[in-house]
UniProtKB/Swiss-Prot annotation:
Domain Chitin-binding type R&R per the UniProt entry, residue ranges: 36-96
MF GO annotations: structural constituent of chitin-based larval cuticle; structural constituent of pupal chitin-based cuticle
GO biological process: chitin-based cuticle development
Keywords associated with the record: Cuticle, Signal
Top-level taxonomy: Eukaryota, Metazoa, Ecdysozoa, Arthropoda, Hexapoda
Free-text tissue specificity from the UniProt record: Imaginal (anterior) epidermis.
Name of the protein in question: Pupal cuticle protein Edg-78E
GO cellular component: chitin-based extracellular matrix
Signal sequence extent: 1-16
Gene this protein is translated from: Edg78E
Organism superkingdom: Eukaryota
Function: Component of the cuticle of the pupa of fruit fly.
PROSITE patterns for this protein: CHIT_BIND_RR_1, CHIT_BIND_RR_2
Length: 122
């Protein structure tokens, strides 16, 4: 019985229709790099993917939006510059808050600098 259900599930997965395989480009804009190195592009597909980016030799800014396989709407904005890639989105993990005792310890260290080291007398 379990073998039958397993085979049936396997066949179902193999035959599942992939929504992304037939996606078509609905709109496309590409402004090639100009003399100063500025560029921008944007496109949208029939399966809901939207991407846009603009930038120059110093960095770029952009946005991406799509629907995840779980049906969640994902929206991401980002900048990329000499300091790295900086994504922003509600779906991204965030670090936990710094505990109060750590903040107190850091404040204590800041307000009580170490005494200057004394040379050993010989």
């Amino acid at each position: 019985m379990y073998k039958y259900l397993f085979c049936l599930a396997l066949i179902g997965c193999a035959c599942a229709d992939n929504i992304n395989k037939d996606a078509q480009i609905r709109s496309f804009q590409n402004d090639a790099t100009d003399a100063e190195g500025n560029y921008q592009y944007a496109y949208e597909t029939s399966n809901g993917i939207q991407i846009q980016e603009a930038g120059n030799a110093n960095g770029a800014r952009g946005a991406v939006a799509y629907v995840s396989p779980e049906g969640e709407h994902i929206s991401l904005t980002y900048t990329a510059d000499e300091e790295g890639y900086h994504p922003v989105g509600d779906h991204l993990p965030t670090p936990p808050p710094v505990p109060a005792y750590v903040l107190r310890a850091l404040e204590y260290i800041r307000t009580h600098p170490p005494a200057p080291a004394q040379k050993e007398q010989q």
